[in-house]
From Swiss-Prot:
Name of protein: Transmembrane protein 120B
Classification via Pfam families: TMEM120A-B
Top-rank lineage group of the source organism: Eukaryota
Coiled coil: 1-39
GO annotation, cellular component aspect: membrane; nuclear inner membrane
Underlying gene: tmem120b
One GO term (biological process): fat cell differentiation
Sequence similarity: Belongs to the TMEM120 family.
Membrane topology listed for this record: Multi-pass membrane protein
Protein keywords: Coiled coil, Membrane, Nucleus, Transmembrane, Transmembrane helix
Record-annotated membrane-spanning stretches: 100-122, 130-150, 157-175, 185-205, 268-288, 300-320
Taxonomic path: Eukaryota, Metazoa, Chordata, Craniata, Vertebrata
Length: 337
């Protein structure tokens, strides 16, 4: 290559560099403008929230001493206030916010807000794929430990994998909630309890008590993975249809339980879910009996019994509540028709 050609290429690169500098300068200015707008929006939302809270309290006091016509106006205002709060929730999904206690402990004060719908949906999609792949891996891991490798070291690897899986799920779910996902209630707490349970299983030392419960736990893990796979497969299809109809949010997630939106087309999963819930109760009863034996010296046995009982109560009562509410709504619809 001749020197003139090298100089020509350098001139071309230099021109592109100058253009890059100008573009980057504009980018920095826009970024500063964006940061200022975010601060203005966050401040305005906080101010609106405070105003609505005061108004809500005033309306509550007025309602006690008003006539029927005024009561209708107050009810209408209360409905609008509730709708406005939902709008604020959607707005905040695109604004930086302080992390909750859990994310602060794990990640520190890092901004985890994703600014575009595309980025939010991509992260949510990655979360769902992670759950699916790990469910399959855990199912094969439990099968291997139960039927092929009866060694403590393989059990420890499996239990460590469970701890890592549930820890990762809680972090990813917290990030999704910061970005507008409406997963809440027991289905958030469920993974924290599962993380604790897996951690206790990991610390349970080898011994007669462990061997007496080992096969039952691994069989339960296989069943749970199979049900979770079924749930992912059918819930993801159902969510896709509901999103296309505009009835569900883009960041709605598949869960390990039953929610009201699953009523159409997914009720066949209920027997599998209830069987899994009662298996958790059976695990709790088995462990309580083991903890009552004179030979039982490990604290993990009683702690696991309590944890399985908490999981059973949370899962069973939450699922039962959803089914009960849906049946009542259907009953009211029949009466109105």
């Amino acid at each position: 290559m001749s020197l003139e050609r090298c100089q020509s290429e350098w001139t071309e690169i230099e021109q592109e560099y100058q253009q890059l500098q100008e573009t980057h300068k504009v980018y920095r200015q826009k970024l500063e403008e964006l940061t200022n707008l975010q601060a203005i929006c966050s401040s305005a939302i906080s101010k609106q929230r405070k105003g609505l809270k005061d108004l809500k309290q005033s309306l509550y006091k007025c309602k006690k001493s008003c006539n029927g016509k005024d009561s209708e106006v107050i009810n209408d205002l209360q409905v609008q206030i509730k709708e406005r709060q939902n709008v604020f929730f959607d707005m905040e999904a695109y604004l930086p916010k302080r992390n909750g206690l859990y994310l602060n402990l794990v990640l520190g004060n890092v901004n985890v807000t994703l600014l575009s719908n595309q980025a939010k949906f991509a992260y949510k999609d990655e979360y769902e794929k992670f759950k699916l792949y790990m469910t399959i891996i855990l199912m094969f891991g439990a099968v291997t430990c139960l039927f092929l490798l009866n060694y403590r070291v393989t059990d420890e690897i499996f239990n460590f994998l469970l701890v890592w899986y549930y820890c990762t799920l809680t972090i990813r779910e917290s990030i999704l909630r910061s970005n507008g996902s409406r997963i809440k209630g027991w289905w958030v707490s469920h993974h924290y309890v599962s993380t604790f349970l897996s951690g206790v299983m990991l610390t349970w030392p080898e011994g007669p008590m462990y061997q007496m419960f080992r096969s039952q736990f691994l069989a339960f893990s296989i069943y749970q993975s199979c049900v979770q796979f079924l749930q992912y497969y059918y819930q993801s299809g159902c969510l896709y249809r509901l999103r296309a109809l505009g009835e569900r949010n883009q960041l709605d997630l598949t869960v390990e339980g039953f929610q009201s939106w699953m009523w159409r087309g997914l009720t066949f999963l209920l027997p599998f879910l209830f069987f899994g819930h009662f298996w958790q109760l059976y695990n709790a009863v088995t462990l309580f009996r083991l903890s009552a034996l004179d030979d039982c010296k490990e604290w993990q046995v009683f702690m696991l019994a309590l944890t399985f009982l908490v999981l059973f109560l949370g899962n069973f009562l939450t699922t039962l509540k959803v089914v009960h509410q849906k049946l009542l709504k259907n009953k009211d619809k029949v009466k109105n028709n």
